[in-house]
Regions:
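N-terminal beta1-alpha1 ligand-phosphate binding loop
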Residues: 2-33
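Helix-loop-strand module that forms the ligand-binding subsite of alpha/beta enzymes
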Residues: 55-135
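N-terminal beta-loop-helix "entrance" segment that forms/cooperates
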Residues: 40-57, 152-156
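A general structural signal for well-ordered alpha-helical segments in protein cores
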Residues: 5, 18-22, 44, 60, ...
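Short beta-strand elements in bilobed, periplasmic/extracellular small-molecule ligand-binding domains
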Residues: 33-46, 139-147
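Glycine-rich phosphate/pyrophosphate-binding loop and the adjoining helix
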Residues: 138-188
Length: 188
């Protein structure tokens, strides 16, 4: 099995915990799984149906190409005012278009929320799951809300808690299995 998973961090902040968490997860991947982390969120313009008639803006084209070329998508979101960040929602709006031919339709997807709060961004996780479901993504049942994320990463960029590391690895393995089931060519 060889599966590429598109990793999308929902924060624009350079020192983002969600981006750091994605990078840390890449250190502990099971064999045959690759995490392609996308850093182009800031380059996606506001969604406008008027722009669909012409070529996609460069940031949108890059996002769509990443998702189309991956077997699955893993999104890690912070919680901003009880929901997902606006820029992440905007990117998902672009990836959900055009209806009937969007790169998210049927794509296996998993969601993680991470927050310094004790709830781990659970409200953002619920909203992200709702958005992914509406887009037609093949959302897995496995999900994680990671509380006190600022204490979960080592200065070297690894996941400090072995139990959390195991849960993230299990989520990624489950997502890869969904990708393989959705596209048997990945199992070769």
């Amino acid at each position: 099995m060889s599966v590429t998973i598109a990793g999308i961090a929902g924060s624009l902040r350079a020192g983002s915990h969600t981006r750091a968490l994605l990078r840390a997860a890449a250190y502990d991947l099971p064999p045959g799984i690759r995490l392609a982390i996308w850093d182009g969120l800031a380059h996606v313009p506001p969604y406008s149906e008027d722009l669909e008639a012409g070529p996609a803006p460069a940031g949108v084209a890059a996002l769509r190409a990443l998702i189309a070329g991956a077997g699955a998508v893993l999104i890690v979101t912070p919680e901003y005012n009880g929901s997902i960040p606006g820029q992440l929602k905007n990117a998902l709006d672009w990836a959900s278009r055009p209806r009937g031919g969007a790169v998210l339709e049927g794509k296996p997807a998993a969601a993680i929320s991470a927050s310094p709060s004790p709830r781990g961004g659970a409200r953002a996780l619920a909203d992200l799951r709702k958005v992914l479901t509406v887009t037609g993504a093949g959302l897995t049942e496995t999900e994680l809300a990671i509380p006190q994320v600022h204490t979960q990463l080592t200065p070297g960029g690894h996941i400090a808690d072995p139990a959390l590391r195991g849960r993230i690895t299990a989520l990624i393995s489950d997502l890869a299995q969904h990708a393989t089931a959705a596209s048997p060519a990945l199992a070769a």
